[in-house]
Amino acid sequence: GLPICGETCFTGKCYTPGCTCSYPICKKN
């Protein structure tokens, strides 16, 4: 599957549903 939580979260927020910020990268919740 494709990584859906790979965005960076320097602002402390993830914009992908079901993801949480594991600074500095969003990870699956």
Curated annotation (Swiss-Prot):
Protein family membership: Belongs to the cyclotide family. Moebius subfamily.
PROSITE patterns: CYCLOTIDE (PS51052), CYCLOTIDE_MOEBIUS (PS60009)
Protein name according to UniProt: Cyclotide mden-B
Described function: Probably participates in a plant defense mechanism.
Keywords assigned by UniProt, alphabetized: Disulfide bond, Plant defense
Keyword Disulfide bond in annotation: yes
Lineage top rank: taxon: Eukaryota
